[in-house]
Amino acid sequence: MAPSKVVIYAMRRELRLSDNPIFHHLSNPESKHGFSHLLPVYVFPAQQIDLSGFVPKGSENPHPAPKSAVGGYARCGPYRAKFLAESVWDLKTSLQSIGSDLLVRAGPYKDVIQSLVEGLKAKECQVGAVWMTSHEGSEEKSEEKTVASFCAKSGIDFKLWDDEKYLIHDRDTGITHLNDLPDVFTTYRKQIEPLREKARKTLPVPEKGALPAYPDIDMIPSQQPPFNIPGTCEELVDAVVRPVKNFLKDLPDFPEKAESSHPFRGGETSAHKRIDHLVLSGGMKSYKDSRNGLLGPDFSTKLSAYLAQGCVTARQIHHALVAYEDGTGTKYKGADGFGEGDNQGTETVRMELLWRDYMRLCHQKYGDKLFRVEGFNGKHTDYEGEDKKYGWRTANTSIALPGQEPTPEKVSEILARFNAGTTGMGLIDASQRELIHTGYTSNRTRQNVASFLAKHLEIDWRYGAEWYEMLLVDYDVSSNWANWQYVAGVGNDPRGAARIFNPVKQAFDYDKDGTYVRTWVPEVAKFENLENVFQAWTASKEDLKTAGLEGNIMVTDPVKPIKFNLDHKPSKVKKRPFFRKRGTKTRDAQGSAESPGSSDSHSGSGGSPDGSGGGNIPSESNCAAAGSGQAQQTHQGSGRSQSSSNHGGRSHSHQHNQQNYHHSHRGNDYTRGGGGGRGGRGGRGGGGGGYSASQGYYGIGGGYRGGGRGRGGGGGFRGRYAPTGGLGGHHHSEQQVASQFQTDA
């Protein structure tokens, strides 16, 4: 009898049996791999999961509860932990159905692999190889290196397989070196298109008995103490959820009329059921129009959590769409649009999947810069050549700038309210409460939450990224962190700090009847006027009394009040929030009300993250948007360079009375041209009131009420869109731009 030769497959974020290159290779008789046994193992890693739920009473967890670096939040909260445990158990069940199994373990990866190798060797089982799939992330790369090092010292073959859960395989992008990856998504997209023809074929599910045998149970070493591995899915869920379920002190009650928009169970089985439902219900076809919804399970695909854990691959989603579009998938025969080719909805889903690919490639290109406060961009220089070194407000007293206002202690209080959803900004609070209750919130609100923290409050954006890491059920390291950078203005958004959302205007645009805010912030449900729903401090004393909100902190001390007129025209506000002259301190974050449409980034249809046209591009994630025909724009000249010890930045509002045009900008980044200033790279400013933006970012045409037609104005973005300036009394909207926050396709 030939001696046993085992291959250990250490699984991480590829929790699926189908379209799995390793399972496919091992089940293919032609591969001639030479292994008699396969031991798939999933390890709950100590550096990301609180393992105290695996420890029996009377014993102690040898590993401290993993916390985030900036905010000190749990690395994995209850919603993702539950989804992950369900996904692991679903894979275990699927493997059992074809004659194999999945070993579940807890602890540091290297310790678990070493224990398995040494234990199998003691039972005279030869471990021929350890295989893993490559994943992005500093911790993930560290796991790969430590396991590879152990294998090398032990004389065991180690192989790192490509991660193939994305839409376009790395070898099919045409990019030979990561430095060649464009820093603008649209440039990358144009290199890849047509998307429908680029995705590789999927790999089938291994047939029963096709995989190498699972080792006899008495040959497999036991879990190292003090951890005990649960024997049922329910027990496994409890083990990972129990240590982190009380993540917020004084968690508000779940609103009576609210329901989760993400009630889905984890695992490959549920993922494919979800895809079929979306196609058959018309959700894929209507996706382009529905994706900005706020309530319910079907306004977006809700496939992002499955993609994040590798329960399904992007190319599996793509080929399901192809089967629907071409009419070859008989199970989709009753779906609207079956056999009629691709449509705007399916095209948009593919674009979202490509954005997810792009975020991962950016992570590969920039590495650990993904987690640095200065982001991908690092140091910026303005058009005059002067280095701009802006910092961020922080709750960390050891790195806060001297004289920081608000103080670190006050920032800590603001963050607590931001996390709990009591800022007084209705859309922000509703999103944060939905998140803490369900682990999910829409792409639209994610964009606004990120912009509110980073742009309006100028608080270190990493607090928000870490909060999302803890709570999002669909957290993905590349998508989450790259998109937070995108919104914060330190990532690869060409508009950088200039892209700012006005959460009041966004609420009027996307929560038109206030249903979303009323659902998740029931305290404001009794208000009749939407402006009171979206900002309770605007309500009259009588209405506050009726609503029972007299003395409520959201009314008496809103974190960031924003004055906004219903006609979407700017109010005349003399106070300038966060205004800082050179060498002076910044005002308190709760000080003055911000001018109305203040640098609103309003998303509409069309556009792309860089403003150069294209589909309604994704986020997770996933982030900003542009003007909606209102005379509201933002200008950026210098950007800002942040470090962990810096903070803040100059920001003020300027009201141009003649044009009734609102500008919000950071730094001295534009100059007013009285008789027609220099415009963007595409043309000259027109009649009176033209502006010259630094680096030629925006050329705003003259002729708005006072000057005839202005050539080359009209708000051309980098000169790309530079139409003739508006007639007197008119204004041009900026090219509409949208980008999703946490990729949701």
Curated annotation (Swiss-Prot):
Start-end of Basic residues biased regions: 571-584
GO molecular function, one term: deoxyribodipyrimidine photo-lyase activity
Keyword Lipid biosynthesis: no
NCBIfam families named among the record's database cross-references: crypto_DASH (TIGR02765)
Keywords: Chromophore, FAD, Flavoprotein, Mitochondrion, Transit peptide
Composition bias type Low complexity, residue spans: 591-603, 632-648
Family to which this protein belongs: Belongs to the DNA photolyase class-1 family.
Organism: Neurospora crassa (strain ATCC 24698 / 74-OR23-1A / CBS 708.71 / DSM 1257 / FGSC 987)
Cofactor dependency: FAD; (6R)-5,10-methylene-5,6,7,8-tetrahydrofolate
Name recorded for this polypeptide: Putative cryptochrome DASH, mitochondrial
Domain Photolyase/cryptochrome alpha/beta: 23-166
Pfam families: DNA_photolyase (PF00875), FAD_binding_7 (PF03441)
Gene Ontology cellular component list: mitochondrion
Taxonomic lineage: Eukaryota, Fungi, Dikarya, Ascomycota, Pezizomycotina
